Regions:
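A short helix->loop->beta-strand "cap" motif at the edges of active sites that frequently abuts
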Residues: 138-142, 343-347
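Catalytic His-Asp segment of secreted/periplasmic serine-dependent ester chemistry enzymes
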Residues: 150-232, 355-445
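Conserved beta-strand scaffold positions in the cores of enzyme catalytic domains, especially
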Residues: 57, 77-79, 180, 260, ...
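Second-shell loop/turn segments in exported
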Residues: 79-83, 112-120, 153-157, 198-203, ...
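Hydrophobic positions in alpha-helices of CheY-like receiver
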Residues: 130-134, 335-339
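Oxyanion-hole/transition-state-stabilizing segment in secreted/luminal serine hydrolases
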Residues: 58, 63-76, 87-124, 148-152, ...
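Charged helix-capping and loop-helix junction motifs
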Residues: 120-130, 159-166, 325-333, 366-374
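N-terminal secretory targeting modules
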Residues: 1-58, 68-69, 100, 171-174, ...
């Protein structure tokens, strides 16, 4: 898979005329809210190509958590967001994107600067510097800045500072260096009223993302397809979980998709870019458990997915270290039975629970239990008519631990880990649609 992506990247270089422009490097940011998450996402993005006609979304939480290609029904819209990013972090990584000469770049950054206490003048200077570098490295790229949403997550003092940033950047943009889009006007009141967010505006729900996508559709050049969803979900799940489910339920229900189901390991992967075929959708939710996936499989009703690729179970043990492997298998069994009943024509691939590395605080005893569940998953494939994929062995070292090179924090995957996983999925016809009915039989023999 990595070799395939290298070929894509090489092609991008040829298409852009071997851009030789360079600028003095930007210093690495002096602070991170989540160092390992930044390393994970930045490392993965560094391996993914961008093409001349691509639209690239760069920036903070709002960008990272959006499924932009699905909002507009266009796989050329690329997500390069990293949750917790501030203007320093975007500035640090913008050159790599700009050198590949995308058609458009959208930047959302500044909220985390305010939360960190960064001065107004510094934020404004960083935004100007971002677009100055883009204009020098890729003069033909159209640039857009999505201004700071002055939501309740900010103190009154921070809101006042944010208003000054927005005003200064709006005035500067009149010079033509980039267009400033007033997304604050589209989102602020809906967030304050609890329609677009349930946590004060750090996260957006389906209605919030619908409003945001609508606010920038003219600049994107395509109509937004995601519809408002502001239904609240059970309080016993995390804020992130509720907002993510709401966003997923707001997306167009298209038939015949290959659906990636699971927890953060699935959630954090750019599946449409790893397999740029236009019909793979990411339905992972960070923190999800087997029963959580079970409770949301109804969202695919009427869509007749071609395939489900399921990977979950990690958080069952994280949330309850005393739970037995047999109990987790029973949860899997119930989920698999219902998938088979509700989606009888959908191919089901059940992937092993991945091991952890000693760097993880949940490492003690985890790998042994995960291995027990994996044996039961393997043993049940013929009874319940699914393909079992042993991804765990591919990313494990001689001790059965997650390889150091496959992880940043001992539990989540690095770019190397995702490439190994993707290479296994790429074998044969697994990631192709509408296959011969003998496929499942062939896989299990």
């Amino acid at each position: 898979m990595k070799k395939i992506l290298f070929v894509f990247a090489l092609a991008a270089v040829v298409l852009t005329g071997c851009n030789k422009k360079s600028l003095p490097p930007v210093a690495e940011p002096s602070w991170y809210t989540n160092t390992t998450y930044f390393a994970e996402k930045n490392g993965l993005y560094s391996e993914l190509p961008v093409y001349p006609k691509n639209i690239v979304m760069v920036g903070d939480d709002y960008i990272d958590r959006g499924l932009w290609n699905e909002f507009y029904g266009d796989t050329t819209v690329k997500n390069r967001g990293i949750t917790y990013d501030a203007t320093d972090h975007v500035l640090y990584r913008i050159d790599r994107i700009a050198k590949q000469k995308p058609g458009k770049i959208f930047v959302s950054a500044g909220l985390n600067d305010l939360l960190h206490g960064t001065a107004v003048d510094t934020i404004v200077a960083n935004v100007k510097h971002i677009f100055t570098r883009v204009s020098k490295l890729s003069p033909e790229t159209k640039c857009y800045y999505m201004n700071i949403v002055l939501s309740p997550v900010l103190s009154e003092e921070q809101k006042a500072a944010g208003a000054k940033v927005n005003e200064a950047i709006h005035e500067y943009a009149k010079g033509g260096a980039f267009e400033c889009i007033d997304v604050n006007a589209a989102l602020q009141h809906g967030i304050e009223e609890g329609r677009f967010s349930w946590d004060g505006g750090k996260l957006l729900n389906g209605a919030g993302y619908s409003a945001l996508a609508k606010a920038i559709e003219r600049q994107i050049g395509k109509p937004a397809l995601n519809l408002p969803d502001d239904r609240e979900y059970p309080l016993e799940v995390s804020d992130y979980y509720k907002h993510r489910v709401s966003m997923l339920r707001s997306l167009p229900k298209e038939k015949g998709r290959i659906v990636m189901l699971g927890n953060s390991l699935t959630n954090n992967a750019p599946w449409p870019e790893l397999f740029p075929l236009g019909y793979i959708v990411n339905r992972g939710i960070s923190g999800d458990v087997v029963d959580g996936v079970h409770q949301r499989i109804d969202m695919f009703e009427g869509t007749k997915p071609d395939k489900f690729f399921l990977m979950t179970g990690t958080n069952d043990f994280v949330n309850d270290p005393e739970v037995s492997a047999l109990k987790v298998w029973e949860r899997f069994e119930s989920l698999i039975k219902d998938i088979r009943e509700q989606y009888p024509t959908t191919w089901l691939y059940v992937q092993s629970i991945l091991p952890m590395n000693p760097k993880s605080p949940y490492y003690a005893g985890f790998n042994e239990k995960a291995a027990e569940v994996n044996k039961l998953l393997d043993a049940g494939k013929e009874r319940y008519s699914y393909v079992y994929l042993d991804i765990a062995s591919l990313v494990s070292d001689g001790n059965g631990d997650l390889k150091d090179e496959c992880t940043c924090d001992g539990i989540h995957l690095s770019a190397t880990g995702y490439f190994i996983w993707s290479a296994e999925l790429a074998k044969g016809l697994r990631m192709m649609q509408n296959l011969d009915p003998t496929e499942m039989l062939f896989e299990n023999n």
